[in-house]
């Protein structure tokens, strides 16, 4: 009850943004679609860790941020476009923690430690033969990146921390943290919905359903609860001052899963760090305006970021839409919901939801309202 009461104060009512639909097709706004390859690394005791690689060049490694599935997550167009943006001249590596996704699902309780997270990252790097790399720690993956950079400075070229924190105890009152872990363990369905509300307070109902389902498919209740407990117990404040690598800390101003105050603490403790704050409240970088996150980190990584549209969607971007997508966009601009559009066009709501997500991705727009405005400017009404 304490966790639910606290979370109720932390999140807003969900809005109409449609940012999470799953789709089999993807096209990057400023590069050709890329192919993801997958493989397995082995831990010292033989457990398999699934990893995925996109692109080529100097390595950018993303430590596991929450529960995940390398293949299923790749079907989410916003995530795919974000990773493709990072992979412009770089090799991007992601992996599933033990107990999640395509990695072996059996995970003993004693492995839920920062040391085991570090060992998992090392196993993936060794399997790929990576000696030196850039680490990009997203959410709780930031703590793994910090720990690794502090203990193996010779292997880390640069450090990017997005949506990160230094001490898990600062993420909520003790009773709320304990209550949230207990809720996830005993009622993973409700717990996953509450976490979705925190990760994306302005997601549409369809987006929350999709993300909730992806969490439950990626890990069972015990693993999710133990990982959440690990997040709350992790403290890397002592590691931060000793990191020699240049660092960039990026955070959205109204992130409710990881507060901006946590990012400020991280940046203050790092000796060679810059802090960049961005508008928005979505916790993961590929939700909301993912291109803005890429533009913020591109100069630091030495890659070409996505272009900044002068006035939102332009004529060229509208030209990327299929005939069906232009038809759906016109109905969105008229204020119709996904179920209403589905009924009008004799499509399933899921298909409409996928079309809307593709429209937002192609137009590089964050919300249905912005897409409606673009449709009006283009004369689609």
Each PLM stretch: what is its role?
Residues 115-133:
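Conserved acidic catalytic loop of the alpha/beta-hydrolase fold
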Residues 40-104:
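Conserved HGGG/HGGXW glycine-rich cap/lid loop of the alpha/beta-hydrolase fold
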Residues 146, 150, 156-186:
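Flexible "cap/lid" loop of the alpha/beta hydrolase fold
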Residues 273-312:
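Catalytic active-site module of serine/aspartate enzymes centered on a nucleophile-bearing elbow/loop
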Residues 171, 189-234, 238-239:
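Conserved alpha/beta-hydrolase catalytic His-Asp/Glu region
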Residues 309-357, 361-363, 370-373, 377-380:
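Helix-turn-helix DNA-binding segment
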Residues 243, 249-251:
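Short beta-strand/loop motif that positions the catalytic acidic residue
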Residues 256-262:
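Conserved alpha/beta-hydrolase "acid-adjacent" motif
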